[in-house]
Design a protein with these regions (language model features):
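Single, functionally critical "micro-switch" positions that shape active/binding sites
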Residues: 14, 85, 114-115
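Hydrophobic helical membrane-anchoring modules
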Residues: 104-105, 110-143
């Protein structure tokens, strides 16, 4: 039994290790001020998806005859880096998602996931390079 009370549960996914300093704090503040049940990390989502069936492709999320310009699409992609959920919602639904859901938009690097050895190697190379030098990552201190 817990000896202290809390209003929110924060899930941080270990397979999405790149996060800017302060981003999680800002996401929690946005969740509280917006009074939502769930807030999740996201990036802009603009691709057109096709599904292969046998030897043909079919559009999934658009009409090829009335295809919008990518700049006119405002969908978001759930990155899975983190979730901020009201405790009462989490226990009521036994799920991270309540009815009022909001996203916290991150950048491309925050959306990178490590699910394969290739992805691990890619992120490792990024961290060793100067590409993320000015990214202000939240990383453990070297000892």
């Amino acid at each position: 039994k817990l000896k202290y009370d809390f209003d929110y549960v924060v899930f941080i996914q270990p397979t999405s290790p790149l996060r800017k300093k302060g981003e999680l704090d800002n996401a929690i503040k946005k969740s509280i001020s917006s009074k939502v049940d769930t807030l999740f990390s996201s990036t802009d989502y603009k691709p057109f998806i096709w599904r292969k069936k046998r030897t043909n492709l079919f559009p999934i999320n658009f009409d090829p005859l009335r295809r919008k310009r990518r700049q006119k699409i405002f969908d978001v992609n759930e990155t899975g880096s983190y979730y901020v959920v009201k405790k009462k919602i989490f226990f009521k639904y036994k799920n991270r998602f309540g009815r009022k859901v909001l996203n916290f938009n991150s950048n491309f690097y925050n959306s990178l996931e490590i699910d394969t050895l290739e992805e691990f190697n890619y992120i490792e190379k990024l961290l060793k390079s100067s590409i993320l030098k000015n990214f202000n990552l939240c990383l453990p201190k070297k000892t």
